[in-house]
Amino acid sequence: MNDKKRILLTVGLYHAFNDGSVAVIPLLFPIFKVLFDLSYTQIGVITGGGLLITLIAQIFIGRISDKKNFRTLLSTGILLLSISLILLTQIKGFLTLLLFILILRFSSSFYHPIGIGWISRTFKKDRIDRGMGIQSALGDLGAFFAILTTLYIAEIKGWGFLFYLWAIIGIGVVFYGSFLTRNINKERIVIENNDKTKQTLKEAISEATNILKRIKLLIPGFVISGAAWGIIVSYLPLLLDEKTTLSLSVIGIIVSIWIGIGVIVCLLYEKIQIILGRRNTLIFGYFTMGVMGFALSIFTDITILLLIMILLGISTFITFPALFSFVSEITHETVEGKTFGYILTIQLGGGTILLFLSGMFSDIWGVWIPFIILGILSMFVALQLIGKRNKNVV
């Protein structure tokens, strides 16, 4: 196995654990809501607060990662994530749940700016769409197994058992990833930046502004794709639990279909974008996502729900590698982490606001409201991309 494949496998496994362990939390909200008497607004505070912590942390982590050892930073994040999962076994109510999730979200902030940046550096000159597609697919695969098994295990073993199980998996992933990349070329682990001048705050802000100007058309897409993940994982189990007679295990299977389809789509992404092109892939993704968002707010029949989740899985997950590949092509390797840190911060900032509003509006009008929000905003992004069809995306 060559160095590039070792890096891709290691980063992919870290992504699988990172996204899988984080996906466990919202699936347990129906249990926590009853156990700790939580309101939808409190759930919105928990999810939005967690994203806010990630937003702040990713700016800092992204900025420092470009001159540091990527493998060490990623391993540190996974170990901290494992520790935070153990802390979650000690939940006593809303405040402790909020505190421990904030710690977990800080720990999960390491992967995306560093891991995606590492893949971007490694594959920038050779099949970047393939690299982004595979790392996205492995992250989705981790979340798929989490969604598929979480509610079932929680019913037979208890929710605390889940956190211990994922913590053990995380420690194992770190040991395996460190072993796998132990002998790879140092140049693939650390990118030296010959510019040793320390930036002033004004220079840092100017640099960030210039980076974001180059991808301004993609920014709404990043926000909606991130918000779609949060809304579906956080509020779909609550919607189905309230509006249907389905058991928690069946609800978990329905949600897992969504992400399982996403795994397949990401693996096929390179071929799809060759046929459609990245821009058309994004237009298709956001238009379909919008239609399915409206559909989720209306239909509760199990057959229709399954069809919706398949189409929503295709449309949601195909947008991530397309967006990241666009950004990778215009980003210099010495500022990969910094660039993805800025982008993911904006993505999570928008997602934080939308998740909080979703919780607040759900208390007022009903838990179907988040999917109306998703439908409207996804349609807006699709129309925006169509309107700019004759211009460069970046």
Model-derived features: positions:
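Juxtamembrane intracellular "pre-TM" segments in multi-pass secondary transporters
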Residues: 1-2, 185-218
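Residue-level signature of mid-helix packing/kink "hotspots" within the transmembrane helices
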Residues: 23, 51-59, 143-144, 259-267, ...
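Extracytoplasmic gate region of multi-pass secondary transporters
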Residues: 25-26, 214-256
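Conserved MFS/SLC helix-loop-helix module at the cytosolic interface between two early adjacent transmembrane helices
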Residues: 56-92
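Helix-to-loop junctions at the C-terminal end of transmembrane segments
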Residues: 57-69, 265-277, 362-363
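Cytoplasmic helix-loop-helix junction between adjacent transmembrane helices
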Residues: 101-139
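Helix-loop-helix hairpin linking two adjacent transmembrane segments in secondary transporters
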Residues: 135-182
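A late C-terminal transmembrane helix in Major Facilitator Superfamily
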Residues: 333-364
